[in-house]
Swiss-Prot record:
Free-text function comment from the UniProt entry: Defense against chitin-containing fungal pathogens.
Keywords: Carbohydrate metabolism, Chitin degradation, Chitin-binding, Disulfide bond, Glycosidase, Hydrolase, Plant defense, Polysaccharide degradation, Signal
PROSITE patterns registered for this protein in UniProt: CHIT_BIND_I_1 (PS00026), CHIT_BIND_I_2 (PS50941), CHITINASE_19_1 (PS00773), CHITINASE_19_2 (PS00774)
Annotated Chitin-binding type-1 domain residues: 24-58
Gene3D superfamilies cross-referenced by the UniProt entry: 1.10.530.10, Endochitinase, domain 2, Endochitinase-like
Pfam families for this protein: Chitin_bind_1, Glyco_hydro_19
Protein name as annotated: Endochitinase PR4
Amino acid sequence: MGNKLVLVLVAVALVMGPKNVSAQNCGCAEGLCCSQYGYCGTGEDYCGTGCQQGPCTTASPPPSNNVNADILTADFLNGIIDQADSGCAGKNFYTRDAFLSALNSYTDFGRVGSEDDSKREIAAAFAHFTHETGHFCYIEEIDGASKDYCDEESIAQYPCSSSKGYHGRGPIQLSWNFNYGPAGSANNFDGLGAPETVSNDVVVSFKTALWYWMQHVRPVINQGFGATIRAINGALECDGANPTTVQARVNYYTEYCRQLGVATGDNLTC
């Protein structure tokens, strides 16, 4: 009964609104930076701390030698997936091997800073993956195909196909044409012409989640877990918009930090 209630609550959360809403303000013109809050411009407020895209002025620290596979054990991931109902489509889709394979394209993930920093980044990413997918139950957003995720302002650069849907898919629930386009280009698939690839190829599915993470979340990871919430779905959740959902994400993060044996750090909410 408890698990069913959790799945119902997750389903409601997935239906409530589009994912990655803060990213709607990114996709800036050449020469402009996308700020940590998702707005385009120049200067330190846009290109400094938390800058997500463009000619950012804040340099990233060099990669460390921490090994993700040693931190992300089979027991850790299976402990999450095992909480999904047996009938969930994602239960037999998402695997540790697929995630590790996707990591070959994003070797800096979880490898900046100390081992504790690596553990916190992995805990943060999987807290969001857990929340977005209901413990890896869902591959696609519930009723997502019935929603319009074609952003008119970016349609010239990322043209939508009338026969395709750009609703939430994969661990991060990648959404919108302006995300599918560049995610496809970065990961060698046709994001605009074949967005369903994210639902059909588990390695690509994880790659798109890692792409989004490295593009939009990694730049703010040193500001605390709350900043990662803002980077993923801040417009719908932060600043009092949905404190229950924020707390749910924080609870997952706190639990995964506990499992990995690392302190959560400060600034957990947004």
